[in-house]
């Protein structure tokens, strides 16, 4: 018997998360690890759960995620974006709630490139007057 699945792709910085929602008890599995195992910081765990908490669907879906690229913070943001998109596919009535909270918007902020003549993107080498 095929179970109902909802997919959503989330992106943030260099991270890409492929999220799969299935009706269940609220388990969150990221790259075959539990949420607590994958994200050691409570703030990152909360970031991942935000769309589910806001829509009160935390105990209605099991979330399976494959995430790659970026660091932990970017990955958490990508997962949040992916979960929000999958929730909208599951129930279109949740769209205004998630949109108002800003979870459906792809955060466009990226790392600024380094320019020649500078140490980093904007940091100049030390200036010597004499």
Swiss-Prot record:
Q: Where is the composition biased (Basic residues)?
A: 111-130
* GO molecular function terms noted in the UniProt entry: RNA binding; structural constituent of ribosome
Record-linked SUPFAM superfamilies: Ribosomal protein S5 domain 2-like (SSF54211)
Give any Pfam family that matches: Ribosomal_S9
User: Region Disordered: start and end of each range?
Assistant: 109-130
Record bears the keyword Nucleotide-binding = no
Sorted alphabetically, the Gene Ontology cellular component annotations on this record are: cytosolic small ribosomal subunit
Is this entry keyworded Chaperone?
no
Q: Domain of life here?
A: Bacteria
InterPro entries in the record: Ribosomal_Su5_D2-typ_SF, Ribosomal_uS9, Ribosomal_uS9_bac/plastid, Ribosomal_uS9_CS, Ribsml_uS5_D2-typ_fold_subgr
Q: Which GO terms describe its biological process?
A: translation
Q: Which UniProt keywords apply?
A: Ribonucleoprotein, Ribosomal protein
NCBIfam families attached here? Answer: PRK00132.1
Say which family it is in.
Belongs to the universal ribosomal protein uS9 family.
- Name the chain's protein: Small ribosomal subunit protein uS9
Q: Which species is the source of this protein?
A: Caldanaerobacter subterraneus subsp. tengcongensis (strain DSM 15242 / JCM 11007 / NBRC 100824 / MB4) (Thermoanaerobacter tengcongensis)
């Amino acid at each position: 018997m095929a179970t109902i699945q909802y997919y959503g792709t989330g992106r943030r910085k260099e991270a890409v998360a492929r999220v799969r929602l299935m009706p269940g008890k609220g388990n969150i599995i990221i790259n075959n690890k539990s949420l607590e195992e994958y994200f050691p910081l409570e703030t990152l765990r909360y970031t991942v759960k935000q769309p589910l908490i806001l829509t009160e669907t935390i105990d209605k879906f099991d979330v399976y995620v494959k995430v790659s690229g970026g660091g932990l913070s970017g990955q958490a943001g990508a997962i949040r974006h992916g979960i929000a998109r999958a929730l909208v596919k599951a129930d279109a009535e949740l769209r205004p709630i998630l949109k108002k909270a800003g979870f459906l918007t792809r955060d466009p902020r990226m790392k600024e490139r380094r320019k020649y003549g500078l140490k980093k993107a904007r940091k100049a080498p030390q200036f010597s007057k004499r």
